[in-house]
Amino acid sequence: LKILSAEGYDKTVIFSMITDGGSSAMELMLLGVCGPASSNPILFLDPTYTNYIDFANRLSIPIVSVNRQIDDNGSFASLNMNAIESTIIKDNPRGLLFIPYDNPSGQFLSKKVICDLAEIAVRNDIWLISDEAYRSLSYVGNESSSIWALNESDVKGISGRRISIESASKVWNACGLRIGGLLTDNYEFHQKA
């Protein structure tokens, strides 16, 4: 939470759980959002970080996904918000996972894009889940991007439905330390995880 505060985010209503690396946080998130051996799916944006797929499969959690297209220049096209919402309506996932500094696509998701995803999550009453392992990175011409930059004035109803996966392995280059975290602004989810 001190890192969030140092980066300028309001941490007053965020609950945290320190985990044995980001991988443990990923598993706890999946279990908390969908339940073990659940019929409740999770929504990924394809391609996604492969460990999420492995963990969901191991925990018998169904996966639904929205494929992203590659433009003629070899870059991933902007997210198709209509396809994301249609998939949510059709498959009823419990949560939508995204990575603002996307691994493996390399696509940067701006605050505007995250707001659009948040509005979809609020409209469809699902969790908005962000893998924040790269949050401290910033790129020329882009401000840092995080689920924790959103507030009620950006997206009415977002409070209480955000979850983030934290890891010291990427930005801090500390893979061997196995320090991760699961953050949420929902006390009930925090207690369940």
Residue ranges of model-derived segments:
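Conserved core of the PLP fold type I
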Residues: 1-119, 135-159, 163
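Conserved core segment of the aminotransferase class I/II
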Residues: 59, 151-193
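Helix-to-beta-strand junctions that scaffold the AdoMet/dcAdoMet cofactor pocket
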Residues: 122
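Residue-level marker for buried hydrophobic side chains located in beta-strands
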Residues: 128-129
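Walker B catalytic acidic pair
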Residues: 132
